[in-house]
Design a protein with these regions (language model features):
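C-terminal accessory region downstream of the catalytic core in glycan-modifying enzymes
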Residues: 52, 477, 481, 527, ...
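Glycan-recognition and catalytic regions of carbohydrate-active enzymes
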Residues: 19-24, 485, 494-514, 526-593
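The feature marks proteins involved in alpha-glucan
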Residues: 1-32, 68-172
């Protein structure tokens, strides 16, 4: 038997690559008259397929051998209509037999253990052929991140019981708080808020929730991949039937598209939940990076890390993303721990997406860091190598996040909005998407995702409360924290780049000071729709800023001339002020923007530039731009903890 280190030596040899690299189709190829299964297993001595009628339980209907072909591919033809039949492979490698699902499975039974052959058009939602990716103007590209479970788990959300915490909750129209007909929730709330995209936390099949058990006491964010090309069963109304999760996932996407909202998929190719997974059971050790002794490298912090630089691993990742883009009409992809992928793989993926019809509209961005030390010895897709990435691959900018609200690893560390001394210097860098700074080697502002909160770490509200108080009352409507929340939003929603927000940030979402709730209770993680109604003024503030931003396209421009056009004022510290002229012919509602940030608890007097300026937002109301003109000039007052915005008329 080979040792893990010997497998590593083999897999990294040029001879192995020449003999086994394969560019053709893999997985099930369905036809009404028969289905062909193809599996890449170059180190196997024998491969067979086990056939089942059900996704769990029941006896095996029979076992058939696969034939070995060139480049490490095995295949078998199953005559007759195989739609709805389940299967596993038994792969014998170096004297050990592994029973596993198909790495290229399109759907599966309970907990993803058995793959299912699927005739997708047979079960697609009505008019699915007419669904398409949404074209979102750059000025409306704001991302709202949510878990499928969190979106509608609250009993007060107004969604029917059977759909709560499921894909189908995104399809129900007309929901209101406690079904009282007043405050809109879920899909109707999103439409009113005005975001351009919803980023869904993992919706592929993950292993940390048991789909065969009630979900009452189970919860996980889902960063535990089991089957990359299969929707998660616990989000369907019937995880025992493989076709249901596929159809309902597509219904969710179609509903969001019909509402004019794009769908971004959070993908986690950097690691898998267990080492006993379809990839490692098919070709042990190949798909995961190894330490010199052959053991798994752990740059993900989850026990293993995907070897994107190995040719067939790269093919798998690209094939999978293409499948979701084409079969599910996904509008964008957010890459978890993108620093664990090599630059070449990410750039090849970007080029491959661009080659699809309409593929240049598909967004690509990710976390430009790792979860630990890695054995990736090629250029990593991280912040340091941003200049090597395609200009159309973006990154989460933790520089912007930390300067605005304070570091995420120290609960008490303040940022600019909490009065951190000297932080105003870096606010200017954030406004210009760091394109006028040597901190980040960005090609253009469109590479920068500007944000202050995401699912990781403290919610924005909890962070503000932890900095302000030794013993925070998280549920209280604290007026000072509310003002700081508005200021934080006023800053990053006027920064260049693409804004991003955690769902509920706009209504002071709290997790009671817990910074990592990936497997905490459903009640702690779910969106609190009563709180959304309670903090409706804050919701309206975000809504107004989103609308204002859409009226001034240059904030979302991708050219490097736009950051260079920002003019900063010399003001009393720690105030920050700047102007940006509209780009010629971009349809902006105002000739220029003039923005001031006041992070102090006092009113401040400043002088506007020459000209006539309309007050668009005063730091409390962000919808003044919609009303009658209030023309300002000369000296004006900035409210405490405020972002004040003027438009030149």
């Amino acid at each position: 038997m080979k040792t893990p280190a010997e497998w590593k030596t083999l897999f990294e040899s040029s001879a192995f690559a020449r003999q086994t690299n394969y560019s053709g189709p893999l997985g099930p190829e369905y036809n009404p008259s028969g289905t062909r299964l193809r599996l890449w297993a170059p180190t196997a001595q024998k491969v067979s397929v086990n056939l089942y009628r059900r996704g769990d339980g029941g006896a095996c209907m029979g076992t058939l051998p696969l034939e070995q072909h060139g480049q490490g591919v095995w295949s078998v033809y199953l005559p007759g209509d195989q739609h709805g039949h389940y299967y596993t492979f038994t792969v014998e490698v170096d004297g050990t037999a592994y029973e596993t699902g198909d790495p290229y499975a399109r759907t599966a039974g309970v907990n993803g253990l058995r793959s299912m052959i699927l005739d997708a058009p047979r079960i697609d939602p009505p008019d699915w052929n007419h669904d398409h990716r949404v074209i979102v103007p750059a000025s409306r590209r704001t991302v709202w991140e949510v878990s499928v479970r969190d979106f509608s788990q609250d009993p007060a959300c107004g969604v029917r019981n059977a759909w709560r915490g499921k894909f189908m909750a995104f399809t129900q129209k007309g929901t209101t708080l406690s079904s009282a007909g007043t405050f809109p929730t879920c899909l109707d709330y999103l439409k009113r808020l005005g975001v351009g995209y919803v980023q869904l936390m993992p919706i592929f099949d993950f292993g940390s929730v048991d789909e065969s058990r009630p979900l009452t006491r189970q919860y996980n964010w889902g960063y535990d991949p089991t089957n990359y090309n299969v929707p998660e069963g616990s989000y369907s109304t019937d995880p025992t039937k493989g076709e249901v999760r596929v159809r309902e996932c597509k219904e969710m996407i179609a509903s969001l598209h019909a509402a004019g909202i794009g769908v971004i998929m959070d993908v986690v190719y950097n690691h898998m939940y267990r080492s006993e997974n379809p990839l490692n059971s098919t070709v042990p050790y190949y798909f995961f990076r190894q330490n010199p002794d052959g053991s798994f490298s752990n740059g993900s912090g989850c026990g293993n890390e995907f070897a994107s630089e190995r040719p067939m691993a790269r093919k798998y990742l690209i094939d999978s993303v293409l499948y979701w883009a084409q079969e599910y009409h996904i509008d964008g992809f957010r890459f978890d721990l993108m620093g664990l992928y090599d630059v070449d793989t990410m750039n090849e993926l970007r080029a491959t997406l661009d080659a699809l019809p309409g593929g240049r509209s598909i967004l690509m961005y990710g976390e430009p860091w790792q979860g630990g030390g890695s054995q990736l010895h090629r250029y990593e897709a991280n912040k340091a190598n941003l200049a090597m990435l395609s200009e159309r691959i973006g990154i989460f900018c933790d520089n912007t996040r930390d300067v605005i609200k304070g570091g995420c690893f120290d609960a008490r560390e303040p940022g600019y909005v909490e009065g951190k001394p000297g932080s105003f210097w870096d606010i200017g860098g954030a406004v210009a998407a760091w394109c006028r700074s040597d901190i980040l080697p960005a090609h253009s502002p469109s590479q920068i995702v500007s944000y202050v909160s995401a699912h990781d770490n403290f919610t924005l509200w909890d962070k503000l409360m932890l900095v302000r108080y030794a013993r925070p009352e998280y549920t209280a409507a604290d007026s000072a924290a509310l003002a700081q929340n508005r200021l934080a939003a006023g800053i990053y929603l006027t920064c260049m780049g693409m804004p991003f927000m955690q769902a509920g940030e706009e209504f002071a979402r709290t997790k009671k000071g817990q910074g990592n709730t990936y497997r905490s209770s459903p009640s702690l993680n779910r969106l609190d729709w009563k709180r959304a109604a309670q903090f409706h003024g804050l919701v309206d503030y975000y809504r107004g800023l989103l609308g204002l931003r859409a009226q001034f396209p240059r904030l979302s421009a991708s050219d490097t001339a736009s950051p260079a056009a920002i003019k900063f004022f010399s003001l009393e510290q720690p105030l920050v002020g700047w102007t940006l002229p509209a780009a010629p012919g971009d349809g902006a509602a105002w000739r220029a923007l003039c923005v001031f940030y006041n992070p102090t608890e006092e009113e401040k007097r400043i002088r506007l530039p020459d000209g006539q300026w309309k007050l668009l937002s005063d730091g409390v109301s962000s919808a003044l731009w919609k009303g009658p003109s209030r023309i300002c000039g000369g000296e004006v007052t900035l409210l405490p903890y405020s972002a004040t915005i003027f438009g030149q008329v």
